Amino acid sequence: MSRFSGALQLTDLDDFITPSQECIKPVTIDKTKSKTGAKITVQEDGYYEESEESGKQKLQKVEITLQDCLACSGCITSAEGVLITQQSQEELLKVLRENQKLKATGDNDLVQTIVFTISMQPILSLAHRYQLSVEETARHLSGYFRNLGADYVLCTKVADDLALIECRQEFVERFRDKEDLTMLSSSCPGWVCYAEKTHGNFILPYIATTRSPQQIMGVLVKHFLAEKFNVPGSRIYHATVMPCYDKKLEASREDFYSEVNGSRDVDCVITSIEVEQMLMEDERSLSQHEPVDLDWPWTDQRPESMIWAHEATMSGGYAEHIFKYAAKELFSEDTDNELKFKQLRNRDFREISLEKDDKTVLKFAIANGFRNIQNLVQKLKRGKGANYHFVEVMACPSGCINGGAQVRPTTGQHVRELTQQLEELYKKLPISQPDNSHTKAIYGDFLDGAHTDKSHDLLHTSYHAVEKLNTALNIKW
């Protein structure tokens, strides 16, 4: 287990963001009048019972929800070991079965519209696992989810594009306002959760307010598509397929609960590993499911392909895209060629600069993995981080392509080797540019234009420092 420093307690945290095995959330115990002679009995099936002279009563089971995880300063990253009842493949399959029954019995007033959104990283992971092309994998996944009961299966392309546009505009506005704070990317929930719980009010002003592609997709599905399909957002069930467990926590944030719809923008998150498990339980390979094209409900004109890559990194391409945009917008410098990032401590910490008139006018960095994040935060605390104007921050080494819930390497294969193979698959994909007719149409048809109050309200969020718990339960002896 890797640790940041002796002053920090990190619960079973290592650089690969595996779920914490211990929960240190204190349970509130209601004090009652002292009683004697009581006996607690545990039955074989796990039933707890307290017996006393006045009779027997079943004891309440301690439950921990995802909201508890977000409000607790104990763990830092994901918490698979707790009772994640609303964010599992079991819950997803239950919802799908119940919806199929409602359709069969004609209870149309209760039937939900089921929408799946698949992120690019799980598509790559499952393509490698089942030895299919990336395009074939996307189509087979679409067919598989439709067979389970999905009405629409989407990719995250349009949300990825909107996230880049919003984030680059936010950076340019901060730069022009002469804010001294380094802007840190916000799409990684593991990083955001760590920042809120460990560094709180110090670090939060640095973080971009742009929502992650998953949560932008949630807004588009529950609001834009709800209007387009004439279906209440409350009757849309939105499931996403993501590369890490922390996306489950992100979807459970109260910031992403819609009072209008009475539901979360993303109802359920499953991961690459969970999709693999579902396929194994069906005893059918992914390739055995009928291929079906992904849906494109956003505009009348369907793009030639919905499987695209972004420049430079497998985590959205924030650093490279925003660097190129800012160089042109702020300094009239064209940087159309592929950028050459300089490796620093390791391959997960890189930087790039723009020089003009013998002066460094832009300096960006990419910091992947908690070791590099810790070094970055310490620089900011010492006042040395201002050298960077923007940093793309991802909790996992190598970024989202190596997410903690991606399909595991085969026996004898090293994680680094698998990651390199996934990177090669990614590099073969066509490059997507966010400025296209589809994003322009969404801004015009749904968001009242770019950089409007509505677009800011729906595509941005806020963060909350989590007060540290003073409990002896998180002390290691």
UniProtKB/Swiss-Prot annotation:
One of its GO terms (molecular function) is 4 iron, 4 sulfur cluster binding. Pfam families: Fe_hyd_lg_C, Fe_hyd_SSU. Keywords: 4Fe-4S, Iron, Iron-sulfur, Metal-binding. It comes from the Eukaryota. Signal peptide: none annotated. One of its GO terms (biological process) is iron-sulfur cluster assembly. [4Fe-4S] cluster 1 binds at residues 23, 69, 72, 75. [4Fe-4S] cluster 2 binds at residues 188, 244, 396, 400. InterPro entries: Cytosolic_Fe-S_CAF, Fe_hydrogenase, Fe_hydrogenase_lsu_C, Fe_hydrogenase_ssu. Component of the cytosolic iron-sulfur (Fe/S) protein assembly machinery. Required for maturation of extramitochondrial Fe/S proteins. Belongs to the NARF family. This is Probable cytosolic Fe-S cluster assembly factor GK14772.
